[in-house]
Amino acid sequence: MSVVERIWWGHRAAPGEAVLLAPLLLAEGLFRAGAAARGALYDSGLLAQARAGVPVISIGNVAVGGAGKTPAAIAVSARLAARGRRVAVLSRGYGASRRDARVVSDGAHVLLGAGEAGDEPALLARRLPGVAVLCGPRRAALAATAVTTLGADALVLDDGFQHRALARDLDVVVLDAANPFGNGHLLPRGPNREPRAALRRAGLVWLSRVDQADEVALEALRALALEATGRAPVESRHAPVDVVDGTLARSLGREALRGARVLALSGLARPGAFRRTLADLGAEVVGERAFPDHHRFTDRELDEALRAAEAAGARAVTTEKDAVRLAPARAADPRLCAVRIDAELVRGEDHLAQSLDAALARGDVLSRSAG
């Protein structure tokens, strides 16, 4: 974790690092002013929002990275598909080698991997059979393609809370209950894209990793969500549902790591959460190689991690999101496996169902009115 990231997530700056704070505070003020001005333009209608012609549900967050948006997007998309909807997920495609609009999955076939699409769209495509996944910088254009070309009648906007150019019928904001706002500052002084007051735009707050949160802090977050949205939050835990080989094609069984010595290999915003997941599976974490979020492991880095694991009498274990970035030959290495995570709802399933149904009804009415 870099010096700036440690400051973001509430670690005290060392004496030699405190010199970074002054320029970061100045930059934070500029960022705050820009974000406020842009938000005011949308709030006033001076910046217009495009309508997709079908219901749109956004999954987003306030802080950058690691809140649990991807498991939430998978859970919401699956629930919409279970309602008989033809669902398409629209993602920016962070880390992709191409910046044009791309169909990652048409719902029947996965067409692109993580290299061209980015790790999150590639993972969504693999985890959501029957759901289309598109990626590109202009979500309004992706929406048009999803509706007119792929026949989608419901859209999930991945990481869409700040992407206000596309109108939505429900904003779901995901907060990591264990550390929702870091040090409380905006970028680049802290991890937040907007002040927490932005939660008033949300229709539903989703608290992830509630099993890792302090109960007093959790009660405060529940009160914050209720005050902001008028509705109690959805609450979930990151549940490890399977251990799979590095190609993600073969299940090794959820108990495969119980009692095993492992080296945690990840490219995540919050690697500590992955270590806790491994502990929950009964593994003994004897080493770690943690890289920045969306990092693509080089051959040298992967070889070093595998050698270190072998030297410690351990197995290298990575996340499903990291594994999709691996070249097929490297993913097939038998010394490597991955953990598959789902968002397991522990509270608020009824709130989620009501919010989704209301958003679908609202979007359908607006679509008929526009037509």
Swiss-Prot record:
Pathway linked to the protein: Glycolipid biosynthesis; lipid IV(A) biosynthesis; lipid IV(A) from (3R)-3-hydroxytetradecanoyl-[acyl-carrier-protein] and UDP-N-acetyl-alpha-D-glucosamine: step 6/6
EC number: 2.7.1.130
Coiled coil regions in record: none
Gene3D superfamilies noted in UniProt: P-loop containing nucleotide triphosphate hydrolases
One GO cellular component term: plasma membrane
Reaction catalyzed: a lipid A disaccharide + ATP = a lipid IVA + ADP + H(+)
Function comment: Transfers the gamma-phosphate of ATP to the 4'-position of a tetraacyldisaccharide 1-phosphate intermediate (termed DS-1-P) to form tetraacyldisaccharide 1,4'-bis-phosphate (lipid IVA).
Name of the protein: Tetraacyldisaccharide 4'-kinase
Organism: Anaeromyxobacter sp. (strain Fw109-5)
Gene: lpxK
